[in-house]
Amino acid sequence: MKFLLSFVVLAVFSASAFAKESPPKIQVYSRNPGEFGKENTLICHVSDFHPPDITIDLLKNGEVIPNAEQTDLAFEKGWKFHLTKSVSFTPTSNDKFTCRVRHLKETKNISWEPDM
């Protein structure tokens, strides 16, 4: 088992060393249509990035929202990676919700649009 795990880790890092740098594609949305005052789930899906060194934060009015859950790092064809982070939230008209993604030396902030 240890040998297999070591082999997989070595294969991922060896192959990723040859992959080209790629900035992330970021999508911010909610599980259900946005409705002020109703509990929902805020989701930030980040895909097509390489290398896998990345940080995702979900923010409410510029502050990190606690208790957010993140999927395990997964890779796609061409050694590009994807991650999803989500958290329960109750939107109000006064709050701004954002997904902040740090990849390599760049930081991007994408706001959630409530579609109301």
Curated annotation (Swiss-Prot):
The domain of life is Eukaryota
One Pfam match: C1-set
Can you supply a Gene Ontology BP term from the record? antigen processing and presentation of peptide antigen via MHC class I
Q: Which GO terms describe its cellular component?
A: extracellular region; MHC class I protein complex
Which N-terminal residues, if any, form the signal peptide?
1-19
Q: Which InterPro entries match?
A: Ig-like_dom (IPR007110), Ig-like_dom_sf (IPR036179), Ig-like_fold (IPR013783), Ig/MHC_CS (IPR003006), Ig_C1-set (IPR003597), MHC/Immunoglobulin (IPR050160)
All disulfide bonds of the chain are 44-99
Q: Give every Ig-like C1-type domain span.
A: 24-111
Q: Which UniProt keywords apply?
A: Disulfide bond, Immunity, Immunoglobulin domain, MHC I, Secreted, Signal
Keyword S-adenosyl-L-methionine on entry: no
Report the subcellular localization.
Secreted
Keyword Protein biosynthesis part of the UniProt annotation: no
Task: Provide the assembly information.
Answer: Heterodimer of an alpha chain and a beta chain. Beta-2-microglobulin is the beta-chain of major histocompatibility complex class I molecules.
The family this protein is said to belong to: Belongs to the beta-2-microglobulin family.
In UniProt terms, what function does this protein have? Component of the class I major histocompatibility complex (MHC). Involved in the presentation of peptide antigens to the immune system.
Recorded protein name is Beta-2-microglobulin
Q: Which organism is it from?
A: Ictalurus punctatus
Q: Which gene encodes it?
A: b2m
